[in-house]
């Protein structure tokens, strides 16, 4: 009887699990946790934590570009407080591909948590290594893998599965855990005619489905788009049409990371006897890395320096450049405003913008197109022209992925909230129980056993803003001040008072920036000065001599008056000088 009780107790708390040929003993009390730190309810800064017991792996560490109201902010990265609190438990960072929204935060993460092994495919790590060196971060712990490779990290075994995307060498992940299998698709689509001839690995996903998948995390970016995403190869057909019609130079702007797109430009240039010049720092870096690693095939005599373009007839030159998003300092944008010192737009140039605007960049792209047209260029843009296709799976491809993997639980990831909801409904429409689908949010802790999934808590999460060299030192209060300055300007009120605060020794003087032009608003400024004087005298009459109280009264008095007269609320900065 005692033996039976002991055996029952052991069975209750301990189980034996065959795992990659080895046997592991694990306490059932330990749960599998999945914690998104970015990439849900937003486009960008993708980052997901997988935890079992005292072992953690991190999937991707991306950045996002600032929203319009984030004035002066350069980049946004995930809040990694949870990782800092558990840094001794992190066994590895595994990367799905080399886009900035998946690797861009790593220079900041690895500076704070060094010596973590980072695994990714060769192109992914080639791009990342350059980013780390630019930021002075050690790159010695990068470990390249190939599609089909399997690595061990703590209690996890991670497999890398080839997928098609708008960058070469992308992969999905299979993650064996003591609780069951997790599949993460990464950013993917099913391209049946890929440029490099390497399709998404259907068999690998199907085999995982046959063996049993506990949780699927899948790309939701195009969950609202019906049908199938066109093949990348169709862009090459559109390029050929444009090359055939072009009489002068061709300038093509695309994402620097889209190596297959660049390859199609090169192939078409060879066919039409045009030399290729590369413009833009990130474009030059990625092209050099891709040639070195063998992802981009370009005959040596095809590539010319940008300084050599005037040595060839215009109809024998094609320039591949950055600037497809209308970024203010990008090469194409500077060309559009005649501010590029090496390339000027000539009437008759054909400009191909081989990308669609990232949400929030529409105005920048539109302005660039207008400026190019004003200079006499022929501009080809927009999805209808066939010169761009998405790198993300549309609805029919998402259905295919679900049917291949057949998971017990599903977490839609990588998309704004409406994308995630659409993907969740799609999964439900093809037979997944609603209670097994988790529409999660950043910071939520999702906990799974073999039979049940639930939200069990929340960890610190959010956005860390990067402004120049400052990481996280700009918060909501600073942004609020910047917004106020950008909308209604600032008034600086300078008053000189005696040390004891008994009388005004000089002033007040008012300096205005971004509010009104003082010389054209003298009456307004004089009355404002009188309001300041009255506010100070009121304080002195009531024996109020604390500078902070006097400053607050000045702010309120002048703010009230200016709003009455102008319906504007400038930032008011009182300065009291002692004599």
Label every model-predicted segment.
Residues 132, 427, 562:
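Conserved hydrophobic residues forming the short capping helix/wall of the S-adenosyl-L-methionine
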